[in-house]
C-alpha cells in the first residue's frame, strides 16, 4: 500500500517521467523498506533519464553552493562572473560546468598533452584540430582514427555505457567524411571469479557487440585484461578507424554570417544530462544514482545517420559538421563557433524533442545519441533537408551563424543564456591547471625484487606452462570476440591467418592497414615512464610483425584523480614515456582521450585503478602481398628468436600471478633497439625471408610459441639457452623479442641477412606435427593446450 501511495504522489508531481519515479522509489525504499533491484533495471527506463537534484535546481539566485554542486570550484565560479560581467543564471552555470569539466576541457591534462609530438609524418591534421586524427595512406586516401573511453558510464550501466561508447567513437570518424571500416577495443575488468565482474563483462561485451554488429563495422582486434584494481571501475576504451578521400575532409567549423545551423539525426531527450560532469568525478557507493547521466544508443538510427552524413559530405552545401557527444548541443555549438571565430544564435524551441516539458538547460546539455550539428551554406538548405528526409531522419534548422564571439540561446521567445563561445573551449577560455605531483612512496618497494628469491630448482615448468595457458590474462578471448562480427564489410585480412595486428584490406589498392591497441598496466604501475614507452614499443612491434610500418598513434589515458599528487605523478611520467617513444618511432600522436577519476570511494577509502595508458597504433602496409601472419605454416619449418633474452622475470604474469609477487621492476627494455627491430621486421617481410612473425609479450616465449602453433594445430621442439634460467627464458617478459619461422631452404638467406644487420638472433628449434617439446622433454600436445587456451574464460563465465 505504501508503494502504491508513493507512486500516485510521484505520478501527480512528476507527470509522465517514469524514470524520476524510479529514482524517487529507489531513494525512499532505503527509508521505508521497499525492495528495488537496481541491477535488473529495464533498459527502457533509461530513456527517461534525469535526476531529482538537477530537475528541481531551477532557482534564480545562483550562489557558489550551486556551482559546487555542479562540479565547479570557487575560483572557476568567480572567473565565470568576470567573463560575463554578472552572475550567471542556472542555464549558463550548467553550460560552464560541463564545458569546464575535465572530460570536455582537459583542464588538468592539456599542459602535459601539449608536450607530445603532435605533427609530422603522414598527418594531414594536427592533434586535436578535428574530431579524429587523419593520416595520408597513399592512393589519394586518408585514414581517420581515434580511441576514447566510456569508463564511468560502463561502471554504472555497462550495456548502454559500452554501446554508446562504440556509437560515439564511430560518429567522430564519419562526421569527418570517413566511412568506418574497423573497430578495436581495450577492456579492463576486476577479478573474473567475482560475480560483479562477470556481470560487468557480460553486459559490456553484449553492449559492444549489439551496437557494433547492428551498425555494421567489424571488430578486428583489441585486448581484455583482469586485475583486482578494476573490481569496481572497469575500463572500456573503444577505437574506430575509417577511410576517406583525403581531399574530402569535413571540418568541425561554423563560419559565414547568416549561414544556417541544423540539428540532424535523433530527437533530443533527457538522457545523458551532465554526462561530461559525471565522467569527471569519482565513482562512489552512490554512483548508481547517476544512471540518468548514462546515454542510450540506437545503432540502427546511427546507421541511417552515417549514410545521410556521408551523402551530405559529397555535396557543396556543407560548411562544417560536428558530432554531438559529451555536453551535447552546447559543446558542438561552442567548438564549431570558436574554430570559425564566430558565434551562433540558437532557438532551442526548434530542437526536435522526444519528451515533453524539457527545460532549456536540459535541451542544451542532453547527450542523446545519434545527433549531429551541421553548418550549411546559405541558399543550400534544400540539399540537407532533402537528404535527411530521404533517410527518414530529423533535420531541423535551429539557428544561424553570427559574426561575433557569442552563443545566444533562446527558448520560447526568451533568451535563456548568452556566453562567449571562446570562453568555453579547450585552448580558449577554459581553465588550465598544473597540478602538484610527487612520486609515490610505494615505488621504492618495486625496485628491490631479486630473482634469486624465487629458487629455480623449486619451479615446476610443466605446471607453470599449464597455469599460464589457462590464465584469463593469457588465454584466448574467444568468449569475447565470438560475440563480435569480424567479417562484415569483408575487409578483415586475418580471419584464416591471424597476425599480431588487425589488418584492413583497402579495397581497390595494394595497401593494407595494420591496427592494434596495447598496454600492460603492471609495467606502468611499476615504472610509469618506462611502462608507457613499452606500450608504444609493443604496439610498434605488433604492427611491424605484420610487415607494416608504424605511422601514428591515438591514446587513451586512464588514471586516478588529478588532485591526488601520486596519481598525477603517474600521469605525468606516462606522458613523458609516451612522448619519448613516439619521437623515437616517428609516430606522432593524432589525438585521443584523458580519463581521470578512475577510482572508487567506498566506506571512505579511495582505491584507484592501475594506471592504464592504452596506445592505439596505425600502420601502413604498402603491398598487402607482404603481409606476414603469426602462425607456423608446416612441420619441419625452422624457428628462430630475434632479440636477446635475459634472466628477467620482472612484472611478468608468471611472477605476478603464479608466484604472487605483486611488486617488481618493469621488464628489460631498450628503446633504441626497439626502433632498429621494427625496421628490421619490415624488411624481413618485404624480402619474404620469413613465413611467420610473432612478438614475445604477455606470458613470455612459451606462450608466443604456443600461439604460433595453435592456428594450424602444429607443435614445436625447441632448446632453451643454457646461459639463462629456464623459467626466465620461457616465461619472462623482457622486451624486444620476436619469434620467426621459415622453410629450411630460406634459412641460409635469413642467417646471412641477420649477420649483416648485426641484430642478435638465435636458433630455437623446429615446428612439429603437434607435440610440444622443450629440452627433449614433452610438454604435451597442441590439442590439449588449445582446448585449455580456447575455453578457459568461457568455463569461468559459466560457473
Describe each PLM feature range.
Residues 4, 12, 16, 21-22, ...:
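Short, positively charged and aromatic/hydrophobic N-terminal segments
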Residues 57-799:
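Glycine/proline-enriched, intrinsically flexible loops and inter-domain linkers
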Amino acid at each position: 500500500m505504501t508503494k502504491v501511495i508513493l507512486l500516485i504522489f510521484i505520478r501527480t508531481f512528476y507527470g509522465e517521467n517514469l524514470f524520476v519515479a524510479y529514482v524517487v522509489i529507489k531513494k525512499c525504499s532505503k527509508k521505508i523498506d521497499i525492495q528495488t533491484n537496481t541491477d535488473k533495471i529495464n533498459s527502457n527506463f533509461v530513456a527517461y533519464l534525469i535526476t531529482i537534484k538537477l530537475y528541481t535546481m531551477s532557482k534564480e539566485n545562483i550562489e557558489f553552493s550551486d556551482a559546487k554542486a555542479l562540479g565547479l570550484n570557487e575560483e572557476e565560479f568567480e572567473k565565470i562572473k568576470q567573463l560575463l560581467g554578472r552572475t550567471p543564471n542556472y542555464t549558463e552555470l550548467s553550460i560552464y560546468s560541463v564545458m569546464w569539466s575535465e572530460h570536455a576541457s582537459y583542464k588538468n591534462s592539456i599542459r602535459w598533452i601539449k608536450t607530445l609530438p603532435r605533427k609530422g609524418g603522414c598527418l594531414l591534421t594536427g592533434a586535436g584540430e578535428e574530431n579524429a586524427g587523419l593520416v595520408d595512406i597513399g592512393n589519394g586516401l586518408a585514414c581517420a582514427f581515434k580511441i576514447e573511453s566510456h569508463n564511468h558510464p560502463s561502471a554504472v550501466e555497462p550495456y548502454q555505457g559500452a554501446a554508446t561508447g562504440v556509437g560515439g567513437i564511430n560518429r567522430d570518424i564519419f562526421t569527418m567524411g570517413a566511412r568506418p571500416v574497423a573497430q578495436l577495443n581495450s577492456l579492463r575488468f576486476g577479478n573474473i571469479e567475482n560475480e560483479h565482474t562477470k556481470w560487468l563483462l557480460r553486459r559490456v561485451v553484449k553492449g559492444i557487440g549489439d551496437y557494433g554488429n547492428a551498425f555494421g563495422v567489424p571488430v578486428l582486434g583489441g585486448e581484455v585484461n583482469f586485475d583486482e584494481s578494476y573490481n569496481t571501475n572497469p575500463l572500456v576504451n573503444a577505437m574506430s578507424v575509417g577511410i576517406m578521400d583525403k581531399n574530402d575532409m569535413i571540418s568541425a567549423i561554423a563560419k559565414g554570417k547568416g549561414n544556417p545551423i541544423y540539428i540532424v539525426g535523433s530527437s533530443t531527450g533527457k538522457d545523458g544530462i551532465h554526462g561530461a560532469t559525471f565522467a569527471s568525478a569519482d565513482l562512489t557507493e552512490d554512483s548508481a544514482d547517476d544512471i540518468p547521466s548514462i546515454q542510450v544508443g540506437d545503432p540502427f538510427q546511427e546507421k541511417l545517420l552515417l549514410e545521410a552524413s556521408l551523402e551530405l559530405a559529397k555535396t557543396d552545401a556543407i560548411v562544417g559538421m560536428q558530432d554531438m557527444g559529451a555536453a551535447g548541443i552546447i559543446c558542438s555549438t561552442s567548438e564549431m563557433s570558436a574554430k570559425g571565430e564566430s558565434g551562433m544564435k540558437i532557438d532551442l524551441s526548434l530542437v526536435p524533442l522526444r519528451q515533453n516539458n524539457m527545460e532549456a538547460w536540459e535541451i542544451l546539455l542532453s547527450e542523446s545519441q545519434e545527433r549531429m550539428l551541421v553548418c550549411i551554406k546559405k541558399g543550400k538548405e534544400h540539399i540537407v533537408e532533402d537528404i535527411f528526409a530521404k533517410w527518414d531522419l530529423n533535420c531541423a534548422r535551429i539557428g544561424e551563424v553570427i559574426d561575433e564571439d557569442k552563443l545566444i540561446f533562446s527558448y520560447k521567445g526568451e533568451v535563456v543564456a548568452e556566453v562567449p563561445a571562446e570562453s568555453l573551449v579547450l585552448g580558449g577560455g577554459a581553465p588550465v591547471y598544473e597540478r602538484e605531483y610527487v612520486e609515490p612512496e610505494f615505488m621504492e618497494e618495486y625496485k628491490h625484487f631479486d630473482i634469486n628469491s624465487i629458487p629455480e630448482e623449486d619451479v615446476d615448468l610443466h605446471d607453470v606452462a599449464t597455469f599460464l595457458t589457462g590464465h584469463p590474462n593469457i588465454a584466448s578471448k574467444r568468449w569475447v570476440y565470438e560475440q563480435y562480427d569480424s567479417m562484415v564489410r569483408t575487409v578483415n585480412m586475418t580471419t584464416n591467418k591471424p597476425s599480431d595486428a588487425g589488418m584492413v584490406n583497402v579495397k581497390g589498392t595494394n595497401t593494407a592497414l595494420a591496427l592494434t591497441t596495447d598496454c600492460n598496466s603492471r609495467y606502468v604501475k611499476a615504472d610509469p615512464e618506462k611502462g608507457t614507452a613499452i606500450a608504444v614499443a609493443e604496439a610498434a612491434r605488433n604492427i611491424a610483425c605484420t610487415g607494416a610500418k608504424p605511422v601514428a598513434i591515438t591514446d587513451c589515458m586512464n588514471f586516478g584523480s588529478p588532485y591526488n599528487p601520486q596519481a598525477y605523478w603517474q600521469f605525468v611520467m606516462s606522458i613523458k614515456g609516451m612522448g619519448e617513444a613516439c619521437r623515437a618511432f616517428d609516430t606522432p600522436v593524432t589525438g585521443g582521450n584523458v580519463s581521470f577519476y578512475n577510482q572508487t570511494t567506498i566506506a571512505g577509502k579511495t582505491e584507484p585503478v592501475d594506471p592504464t595508458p592504452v596506445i592505439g597504433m596505425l600502420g601502413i602496409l604498402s603491398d598487402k602481398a607482404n603481409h606476414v601472419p603469426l602462425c607456423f605454416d608446416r612441420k619441419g619449418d625452422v624457428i628462430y628468436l630475434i632479440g636477446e633474452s635475459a634472466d628477467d622475470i620482472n612484472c611478468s604474469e608468471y611472477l605476478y600471478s603464479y608466484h604472487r609477487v605483486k611488486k617488481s621492476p618493469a621488464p628489460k627494455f631498450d628503446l633504441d633497439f626497439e626502433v632498429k627491430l621494427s625496421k628490421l621486421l619490415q624488411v624481413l617481410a618485404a624480402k619474404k625471408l620469413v613465413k611467420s612473425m610473432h612478438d614475445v609479450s604477455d606470458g613470455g616465449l612459451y606462450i608466443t610459441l604456443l600461439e604460433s602453433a595453435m592456428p594450424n594445430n602444429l607443435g614445436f621442439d625447441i632448446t632453451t639457452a643454457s646461459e639463462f634460467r629456464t623459467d626466465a627464458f620461457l616465461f619472462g617478459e623482457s622486451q624486444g623479442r620476436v619469434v620467426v619461422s621459415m622453410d629450411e631452404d630460406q634459412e641460409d638467406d635469413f642467417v646471412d641477412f641477420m649477420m649483416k644487420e648485426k641484430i642478435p638472433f638465435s636458433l630455437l628449434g623446429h615446428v612439429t606435427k603437434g607435440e610440444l617439446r622443450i629440452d627433449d622433454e614433452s610438454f604435451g600436445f597442441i590439442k590439449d593446450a588449445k582446448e585449455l587456451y580456447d575455453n578457459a574464460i568461457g568455463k569461468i563465465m559459466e560457473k
